[in-house]
Amino acid sequence: MESQQLSQHSPNSHGSACASVTSKEVHTNQDPLDVSASKTEECEKASTKANSQQTTTPASSAVPENPHHASPQPASVPPPQNGPYPQQCMMTQNQANPSGWSFYGHPSMIPYTPYQMSPMYFPPGPQSQFPQYPSSVGTPLSTPSPESGNTFTDSSSADSDMTSTKKYVRPPPMLTSPNDFPNWVKTYIKFLQNSNLGGIIPTVNGKPVRQITDDELTFLYNTFQIFAPSQFLPTWVKDILSVDYTDIMKILSKSIEKMQSDTQEANDIVTLANLQYNGSTPADAFETKVTNIIDRLNNNGIHINNKVACQLIMRGLSGEYKFLRYTRHRHLNMTVAELFLDIHAIYEEQQGSRNSKPNYRRNPSDEKNDSRSYTNTTKPKVIARNPQKTNNSKSKTARAHNVSTSNNSPSTDNDSISKSTTEPIQLNNKHDLHLGQKLTESTVNHTNHSDDELPGHLLLDSGASRTLIRSAHHIHSASSNPDINVVDAQKRNIPINAIGDLQFHFQDNTKTSIKVLHTPNIAYDLLSLNELAAVDITACFTKNVLERSDGTVLAPIVKYGDFYWVSKKYLLPSNISVPTINNVHTSESTRKYPYPFIHRMLAHANAQTIRYSLKNNTITYFNESDVDWSSAIDYQCPDCLIGKSTKHRHIKGSRLKYQNSYEPFQYLHTDIFGPVHNLPNSAPSYFISFTDETTKFRWVYPLHDRREDSILDVFTTILAFIKNQFQASVLVIQMDRGSEYTNRTLHKFLEKNGITPCYTTTADSRAHGVAERLNRTLLDDCRTQLQCSGLPNHLWFSAIEFSTIVRNSLASPKSKKSARQHAGLAGLDISTLLPFGQPVIVNDHNPNSKIHPRGIPGYALHPSRNSYGYIIYLPSLKKTVDTTNYVILQGKESRLDQFNYDALTFDEDLNRLTASYHSFIASNEIQESNDLNIESDHDFQSDIELHPEQPRNVLSKAVSPTDSTPPSTHTEDSKRVSKTNIRAPREVDPNISESNILPSKKRSSTPQISNIESTGSGGMHKLNVPLLAPMSQSNTHESSHASKSKDFRHSDSYSENETNHTNVPISSTGGTNNKTVPQISDQETEKRIIHRSPSIDASPPENNSSHNIVPIKTPTTVSEQNTEESIIADLPLPDLPPESPTEFPDPFKELPPINSRQTNSSLGGIGDSNAYTTINSKKRSLEDNETEIKVSRDTWNTKNMRSLEPPRSKKRIHLIAAVKAVKSIKPIRTTLRYDEAITYNKDIKEKEKYIEAYHKEVNQLLKMKTWDTDEYYDRKEIDPKRVINSMFIFNKKRDGTHKARFVARGDIQHPDTYDSGMQSNTVHHYALMTSLSLALDNNYYITQLDISSAYLYADIKEELYIRPPPHLGMNDKLIRLKKSLYGLKQSGANWYETIKSYLIQQCGMEEVRGWSCVFKNSQVTICLFVDDMVLFSKNLNSNKRIIEKLKMQYDTKIINLGESDEEIQYDILGLEIKYQRGKYMKLGMENSLTEKIPKLNVPLNPKGRKLSAPGQPGLYIDQDELEIDEDEYKEKVHEMQKLIGLASYVGYKFRFDLLYYINTLAQHILFPSRQVLDMTYELIQFMWDTRDKQLIWHKNKPTEPDNKLVAISDASYGNQPYYKSQIGNIYLLNGKVIGGKSTKASLTCTSTTEAEIHAISESVPLLNNLSYLIQELNKKPIIKGLLTDSRSTISIIKSTNEEKFRNRFFGTKAMRLRDEVSGNNLYVYYIETKKNIADVMTKPLPIKTFKLLTNKWIH
């Protein structure tokens, strides 16, 4: 039975179509209608409401649509007669009996004609005493009089009922819903009572007081039909009427029984909630009363657990018992029995008879045998409810996860078995077994099920009433063939093999058990939360644990998919042997193929299509009779439900009829689908499909882009294929009006080939239904195949091609043939087909050695189009091959991820299909095939560049048993490697370069040499061979820990390209015991660095210790160490993978090191990442290829740029001007003029909206008294310099509203008309970011306000005049300004002074010194940006008080109050912010960039590729003089200003990772060469590809006592023109990036150390200013830190030696930095170069390094 909570119980829940009815024990002395006074009033109110709508006209009466029904009349007016009988609603006392009315004696034998069966027919009897309806038929029922009452009439005869007849009786209301039937029955019974028929109403024992007469039965039948239409009757009522349509008495009897049951339950609940006990009655009586109530509620499906029961009992205790409420309330595991023991003890003390009464304390063994979930009796007992159950009662069913259980045993045992659905029970029949009993004979079906959705776990289900499991190996004390049925949600029976106990052993070493049913016919193993609750175990989904009521955690819960799971490792296995299996074994020759297997084999087609195909032999090898179709009707494929989910179906039959007259392949439909995002460069982003109108044959072709030449190539291919293969000529091609089809190139091609293009007409979407439906179908199939197989998304077109092959072979239910048959081709041999994603092993014909494994794991995709082979995807080689040398992989290790009917489920069926094809590993194979691993030239995915999700075998091989890593780790790793190598990779890195496609034909046995990365000084380290040293114990531990990082699974790949090899020890995951290099401890290394004299002329080499952060000075106190750890702890630094061991061959030892010279490059120019190249390996380094970002565009520069030093002798006039005028960046114009928006606007709707906005702005100007309307001035009389030109500007906001603004032309305003000393201040972006960060950490409410027409609130002091608005028509007149109009030079300053004064004087705020437009008081912080305000406070009421004060003076509009606890979205100063208070904040600009970037006219997504980094290292800007004319030069400069303007706006808002590229390109705005434009296009393209990226903040730990402000600094020495250095700084508050800066050093530095000192000195002033702001806004202490990767810089800062400063400038700079660090309490620490996220601010980085440094804080 379903567990119900006390507060969720509804007395009207009976009678639903899905629930059975259980008859319950009913007291005969209680009126079933007398539930409660409140319910009676509610019922009558409902009937009044229902009838009040039917009182006015005849059309609103009870049955208005019947032509025989007339409106009721008063008694004095005779009713109209439309036939031989009176109207059914005009029942009078003295109606005459019509002739022929007398029927047979028994009511059930009344002969009804079809007309008489109508609800409108009512033939009264000769002496009928039925009352007449009043004139207001259908009006609400009046309150019953005392004589009619709310009880049944217990008259002894019919005559007594007839004596007190009322003249008028109101009819019952009409039944309008099955759910209202219980309430309607109550009013109907009252209607019968008022009609003197109370004696025929069944009493509580089911029998009426007297026998019903024929007249009364007819009256009962007709009135029931009139007021209870059949369409609104519940299912159980319809079932009774289907047996006997006149058996209204049975319906009334059952309704009364239900009402009585509900009344008893309600009374019990009320009684239990209002218990009172003070010892005045015996404790025995009180205990009996309470336990009886609880037992009744539990038996009726209302489960009262111990905790609730004890709380209700204790709440009613008073007197001397009241102290139990305070002594027991903390006892969480208290039971009802224990509570009553204390009550008995107090009662015995009160009576003074403790020794004379028996002791009520029971033995623990008695409590264990109690049948309830709590113990409150002295002996176990079985509660049997309703011992007098009638024959027509049904047992209550209990629901599980889509299943429910009911009992089929005799009625005497029914209750005990039903009770077991929610709690442990005491069984009574011979099959009952207690826990611990031995099993003598059993037929439990032990079935191994290891293919759950989440293997090895149980599905937690709150709706399940019973626990069901498929494997019998965990069932204890099992008994076979129990008399219990399992019913799913569709009421289908599922057989149960056995019942037993499921025993748990949890983390706290506690054991418990619940009842479990065994069946192999369910999708998942279900664990009922109701049964766990019965043993005091609950599921906490906030903490994801199973716990007891006292909070003890028992086991974790796993969230997988949409469900929650708990591991089976907590189950105790049974020690019984596997019993006899009940299933009948079917021989191999007669067993049929299961339908789910065929469904998946044939691309998840529907059953009807597959049957048609088998009948018509379009699918060969087996017949329709070979498939088991029993489950086809009810089978639901989860992959189809997920992959093919749709909104609605396309409209069929929408094509024109004339198309049917064409011959095959003369009329084609075509359409393009795409793009598909986040794919590797080699994978297509689009596909184009063709469908023949006559044969319905389909073709699909992949596309990387939608350019004209790409589309033309496909058209050429398809036309040639049809002409040569089918000897047909295409006459017409139907397509939509996309630009890829309407371009001139394709039009000329079709015209040249004599093909008519048929375009869809405007708004005729139905005409293109063939191509659109095909694309939708193929896309559904693609999603389903990928979902089912678990293959990565970049193989999506392989799924499309597989589906096309199958779809062409399936018969159409309409034509009874397949497309292949229509085309004259043979049917598809299904034995040549494999399920998409089937695991296989491919033969490796060219291994490294004879002992190398010959098999490569792969996944079958689709049959080859160019050979007899199969296209197979090989994750380890990152490619697809076309081969016939493969074998199907079977067994557990080949299992895919998603569902339990994947390849493993049908291994035997698959073997039967492919039996005729021998594997290359078969024992009888003699000759080896010659077509080994034929690479498919046709396939676009023949070569896939991927990072497969599988660790390499070299890791497990490198670990020796003597390593310090625990042995368990080796075992787990080896298992994981073997298992992962045969699993489909779930995800793939979409940003892998296209150049690394083919692996080498012969894998080299020589490993690659890791590249050497430059140090902070830009110099290179020489390689001392051998490099490897044995790991110390600490290093081994750290490597082992790092190897477990989930973010970096390819540690060997990273170390080959990103590791710095020096002469210091290198930690290795492999634990190589190389004894040729002496071991150097971390302490000794650190000691050498500390005591070494700092070198000024040349930077010291970087230490590459395995420590993440190494302090440069020896800590003197523990507090300083804690400070360092505290500063570093929350920073979003990358997690470095462990460095793998690298072995170098002997020939390499003889090679001299390769040195790379420095170059002067605008974008880095230092080829340090390629200092060492791969030796003896033809395979190119993936990291080298990732840095070669190539974007295909006809006008883009395709020349291979090399790192060459540019000549310095050439003059660069434009470049010099650009450097001096970097700030001349023009914003993008997004507004319209008056003539563009209104005068010449051809869009009528938009024009009307702009006109409306125009008038709204004019009215606002007049309302604010912007100008003097009393006098107009002549233009000739006013000094021209005091006349300000004005204009209207219009724009459309992102929310869709149209805005108009009247502005002054301040750009041409005369200087004498304003005070140049006034400042128009706005909030600094760093102040806003700081306030947002503090708001997140302190759970502040954020409120956003807007002050309408803010400038107009500020008066203007100067005498200025403007022209009137255009609509006034006074072009020769002037008006004098009184308010600060938008656009004036002084308007901003005037408004700032106005609002500042009001906030300080009226709102009690004060402005933070040094930070303009930041106001604060003790509760609220305000950031002001012109007319936008952002309020921050701990208490939302504080914000509201400020708002109220602002509204008193200004028109203040609340944009976002910020009161919700869920995620709130803001648009603050261009930043799109998602904020959930106390959890996270995300800052981005996706919507803004999506709108603005396309308006720049930059070609986006050329060739469908996505950039992985904004630039590439190793290039410099060729700065030759420009040879272009003046007009073209201005046009390009203007274009650069727009592009760099947008990039700067975005970069300084939140995309700090782009600042280096923005700063570098901004220096070349006035030098718009083709290369500069190409690099700018590349930057905009990257911004477009990553427009969805966000700056991610998470709330700081609440335990942090201090605010931590950190600046991370970096410098690239001499990498800018004229050997200038690039410096960069990133600022973080409590681990959140709040700002960044990248700029070229103002002076030329002579060393790396000097550049680093310059970078740090640039960061200190802003760091101090931010520190002051933070202390003003938040009173917590603040810790300031500086992080740099230059040890020599730190040494100079810490040292007191001034002798080695090379010059005065360098010395003064260093000394000043020393003073700033010491005077401002700054902590300076060292950070590894690989972890220095400020590195992205100073130079272009390889893709992998760029991602590594940024993916922690922006993604």
Swiss-Prot record:
Its EC number is 3.4.23.-, 2.7.7.49, 2.7.7.7, 3.1.26.4. Mg(2+) 2 binds at D1346, D1427, D1428. It comes from Saccharomyces cerevisiae. It holds the Pfam family rve. This is Transposon TyH3 Gag-Pol polyprotein. One of its GO terms (molecular function) is aspartic-type endopeptidase activity. The modification Phosphoserine is found at S416. Keywords: Aspartyl protease, ATP-binding, Cytoplasm, DNA integration, DNA recombination, DNA-binding, DNA-directed DNA polymerase, Endonuclease, Hydrolase, Magnesium, Metal-binding, Multifunctional enzyme, Nuclease, Nucleotide-binding, Nucleotidyltransferase, Nucleus, Phosphoprotein, Protease, RNA-binding, RNA-directed DNA polymerase, Transferase, Transposable element, Transposition, Viral release from host cell, Virion maturation, Zinc, Zinc-finger. Residues 1-93, 126-173, 352-421, 956-1087, 1092-1111, 1130-1187 are annotated as: Disordered. Residues 1338-1476 form the Reverse transcriptase Ty1/copia-type domain. The record marks H401, N402, N582, N583, A1217, A1218 as: Cleavage. The active site is at D461 (for protease activity). It is found in: Cytoplasm; Nucleus. Initially, virus-like particles (VLPs) are composed of the structural unprocessed proteins Gag and Gag-Pol, and also contain the host initiator methionine tRNA (tRNA(i)-Met) which serves as a primer for minus-strand DNA synthesis, and a dimer of genomic Ty RNA. Processing of the polyproteins occurs within the particle and proceeds by an ordered pathway, called maturation. First, the protease (PR) is released by autocatalytic cleavage of the Gag-Pol polyprotein yielding capsid protein p45 and a Pol-p154 precursor protein. Residues 583-640 are annotated as: Integrase-type zinc finger-like. The capsid protein forms a homotrimer, from which the VLPs are assembled. The protease is a homodimer, whose active site consists of two apposed aspartic acid residues. GO terms for cellular component: cytoplasm; nucleus. Mg(2+) 3 binds at D1610, E1652, D1685. Its main location: cytoplasm. Mg(2+) 1 binds at D671, D736. The C-terminal RNA-binding region of CA is sufficient for all its nucleocapsid-like chaperone activities. Integrase core domain contains the D-x(n)-D-x(35)-E motif, named for the phylogenetically conserved glutamic acid and aspartic acid residues and the invariant 35 amino acid spacing between the second and third acidic residues. Each acidic residue of the D,D(35)E motif is independently essential for the 3'-processing and strand transfer activities of purified integrase protein. The keyword Transferase applies.
